[in-house]
Amino acid sequence: MNLLDPFMKMSEEQDKCLSGAPSPTMSEDSAGSPCPSGSGSDTENTRPQENTFPKGDQEMKKETEDEKFPVCIREAVSQVLKGYDWTLVPMPVRVNGSSKNKPHVKRPMNAFMVWAQAARRKLADQYPHLHNAELSKTLGKLWRLLNEGEKRPFVEEAERLRVQHKKDHPDYKYQPRRRKSVKNGQSEQDDSAEQTHISPNAIFKALQADSPHSTSSMSEVHSPGEHSGQSQGPPTPPTTPKTDVQPGKPDLKREGRPLQESGRQPPHIDFRDVDIGELSSEVISTIETFDVNEFDQYLPPNGHPGVGSAQAPYTGSYGISSTPSATTGAGSAWMSKQQQQPQQHSLSTINSEQSQSQQRTHIKTEQLSPSHYSDQQQQHSPQQLNYSSFNLQHYSSSYPTITRAQYDYTEHQGSNSYYTHASGQNSGLYSNFTYMNPSQRPMYTPIADTTGVPSIPQTHSPQHWEQPVYTQLTRP
């Protein structure tokens, strides 16, 4: 507390000083005397203080700030520092608290600055209400209107200032300070631009089973109930011919990049809020119907020899998101619901080509007309559902024969939020299908039993998609 004793003395004397008017005739030993009676008395007053304090006044000031002394002590210190003649202490010049030894040297004024400075002072005195920015604009306009003769005195003054500046600061070098704020603003704008560029694709990541690019290379298509299983894009089976590549190029162009499967189940998106205009207008003719004739060019002329094709009623309104498909992908086996394990609530996939393990097995769908799967969960309204034929290719020869495999999709609604559509639908909506071995019927498998479906006319040339089948269902 030795350091604090002089401070306490100073504060007491300072209180006395503040109580009465400070005058130069105050006692000489009052260390905190704020008297402006000349440098000699000031130095005499303050030099005993230097002897008393083992540390310099500057360090004392730091200590007072660091240790948060009371207000009276701070005031006393400020009085001492104010009264001290700082020319006696050698110290580096500090500009804005920076540790540079050299003070900031301004550039010499050019001719316009000489003009603007003089004119601004004059105008500011005459018209104090003028705003400074408006004044600067007006001075700039006036400067451009001046002729060479009128500018000459300012040019000469600027030249004189430049020569004087060079004498005063012979080693002066102009070093402009970089403005970080502007670059930060630009980078923020760039970041926001990137975010706005990415955000539409976030929709397509959830919708990626809808757009026909997901059937590119006629490979596996992952319906939304199956997003959790795949961590990469749809793989191309080895049987894919090169004529089938990229049936969904219109939508790929719109998206700008192929969408990756997320490794986990994304949150359920209410696709009723998604603008269908973002999907391909070349692909979707209307919400209610879907025309598959335009994809004839992408299909091979005779299909795949030795590969089974099946025709299945498919939920129409090929709009926004996909239904659990009645067609399974790339050598996967059909199982009736009696064969399923009840806790899975989805068809397990037997994939002989890729054998990819899934976190939770879901329906593997293969969509060979590059049409959009429709989301039956949107069909709570009693509108009529359209059905189009689907041509299943790339089935391996291990395709089992299961007759009358019934699929009751009301059983699946507990496993995934995508199956909540099935609550309003009858279990007879997915009727009994007969799937035959490819060796028996290599080209085309008709629907054998149409008990749940009113009428499904069979197409005569399914490999060319000339007659898309539309079957209309009404809600029970």
From Swiss-Prot:
Print the domain comment field.
The 9aaTAD motif is a transactivation domain present in a large number of yeast and animal transcription factors.
> Cross-link Glycyl lysine isopeptide (Lys-Gly) (interchain with G-Cter in SUMO), residue numbers?
61, 364
Q: Which UniProt keywords apply?
A: Activator, Chondrogenesis, Cytoplasm, Developmental protein, Differentiation, DNA-binding, Gonadal differentiation, Isopeptide bond, Nucleus, Transcription, Transcription regulation, Ubl conjugation
Q: Which residue stretches does the UniProt record annotate as biased composition, category Low complexity?
A: 30-41, 319-344, 369-383
Q: Region Disordered: what ranges?
A: 1-67, 157-197, 209-274, 318-383, 443-476
Annotated SUPFAM superfamilies: HMG-box
- Family matches, as Gene3D superfamilies: High mobility group box domain (1.10.30.10)
Where does this protein bind DNA? 105-173
Location of the protein in the cell: Nucleus; Cytoplasm
Q: Any keyword Nucleus?
A: yes
| One BP annotation, GO | morphogenesis of an epithelium
**Where does this protein have compositionally biased stretches of type Polar residues?**
42-52, 211-220, 345-360, 452-476
Assembly, in brief, is:
Interacts with the sumoylation factors ube2i/ubc9 and sumo1.
Motif 9aaTAD 3: where in chain: 427-435
Instruction: Give the matching InterPro entries.
Output: HMG_box_dom (IPR009071), HMG_box_dom_sf (IPR036910), Sox_N (IPR022151), SOX_TF (IPR050917)
Q: Name one GO molecular function term.
A: ubiquitin-like protein ligase binding
User: Species name for this entry?
Assistant: Xenopus laevis (African clawed frog)
Q: Which top-rank group of organisms is this from?
A: Eukaryota
The motif 9aaTAD 2: which residues?
291-299
Name of the gene: sox9-b
Identification of the protein by name: Transcription factor Sox-9-B
What PTMs does it carry?
Sumoylated. Lys-364 is the major site of sumoylation, although sumoylation at Lys-61 also occurs. Sumoylation plays a key role in regulating formation of the neural crest and otic placode.
**Where does the motif 9aaTAD 1 lie?**
276-285
May I have one GO cellular component term? nucleus
